[in-house]
Amino acid sequence: MTHHTVAIVQYPPAVLDLRASVMRSVAHVTEAADAGARLIVFPETWLTCYPAWAFGMAGWDDAEARHWHARLLAESPVLGATADAADALADLRAVAANRQVTVVMGLNERSNTGGTLYNSILTIGPDGSTLNVHRKLVPTHSERIIWGAGDAAGLRAIDTPVGRVGGLVCWEHWMPLARQALHASGEEIHIAAWPETSDIHQVAARSYAFEGRCFVLSAGLYLAVEDLPEALREPFRIGVGPEAPASGLLFDGGSSVIGPDGHYVVEPVRGRPGIVLAEIDLSALDRAHHDLDVVGHSARNDVFELRVDARRRDGVVVRRD
């Protein structure tokens, strides 16, 4: 089967409330599944919001910045215990299994020891299990005061019932070697996770689809001022900057679906919350590869070689033998 319905969730999370956000995600997955979607995608750090307020606060030994960073840590899930009662995402896994859908969730991932956050993409299979976790390789610019650097353990496409799915976070789309690693893993559907989707982000998503000869689900966050706690509204406005989309909105969505020719299947949806749906046909990929295959007949493997260390980098390796 090559025809599939896919969906992007363009609703706001419950900011800094992990439990409430998970329950919202269950409702949104249910809505998308009711509409026929078999792959359901959320934007960058949807759990539990992109922390733009950090860019509007003092970053060094500032009590307010420390307070909100601690809140973000406390409301960010630790991944890895799919069957454990303490798994904060158990309800999301359950709805994925119940509806037999694949869910791709952007989230703030907390390390299982210490207090580091990662900007991650979690892929949950239709049995509720973790299929992949990709951690953003290099947090962009001032994001480095929030997130640690990821590794290449999740830099791959994985098999799902709707095709081979991979993803990158925001400015990773301007990392040519990361793109090539995903192309080489046989990616058919690419998740481009963003907080905002300005014109240049749309250029990157469309270019990725054309280069990789794949479908791209470009997921943008929808967030209004009233979605934030009162104390975070002004720092968030400062963090977003002067290009906030409209009065009352901080991020206006802009989610889209792009075909392997780089043209829109669904043009950017801006200024309203909802589920963005699209029908895709994977047989289009073979036709698109007729004139471009960046890891095949358009490549020069005798000239260029890319090496990727795909080990999970935990820093401390303990041997007891």
Give each language-model segment a name.
Residues 1-8:
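Extreme N-terminal starter segment of soluble prokaryotic enzymes
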Residues 3, 125-126, 258-259:
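Short, acidic, Ser/Thr-enriched surface-loop or helix-capping motifs
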Residues 5, 104, 120, 154, ...:
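Conserved beta-strand and immediately adjacent loop positions that scaffold enzyme active sites
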Residues 7, 122-124, 256, 276:
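Conserved hydrophobic/aromatic positions in well-ordered beta-strands
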Residues 29-58, 96, 103-104, 172, ...:
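Active-site beta-strand/loop signature of hydrolases that rely on acidic residues for catalysis
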Residues 54-80:
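A charged helix-plus-loop insertion that forms the helical arch/lid used to bind
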Residues 81-84, 89-90, 94-97, 101, ...:
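Active-site catalytic loop in hydrolytic enzyme cores
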Residues 157, 221-321:
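C-terminal beta-strand edge segments of enzyme domains
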